[in-house]
Amino acid sequence: MNATAGLPVVGVDLAKSVFQLAVADGAWRIVEQHRLTRTQLERWFANRAVGLVVMEACGSAHHWARWLNGLGIEVRLLPAAYVRVYVKRNKTDAADAGALLEAARLALTSRQCG
């Protein structure tokens, strides 16, 4: 399954006021990282073509998933326990966003996700 169709995949670490994004290319290499406020996040997604967004399932994840679906972006929510094992460094927002991409890559290639 090619969920990205040549478009970037974005891992989003959700937080109360600042969000960390890791953007991967079609080969799942992280090519960009961003730290955005809520307003900046909304503007960023509204102005970008994105193939897939992966987020850790949490309280606000469903709100953001619905909003992103409204923009025509496919969203996958991953259980926190599944993502946690892919954090390779100290736990930071940037590491979490990268771990989301790694977890999604492995889940999509083994068909465990969605």
Predicted segments with their positions:
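Phosphate- and other anionic-substrate recognition elements at nucleic-acid/protein interfaces
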Residues: 1-114
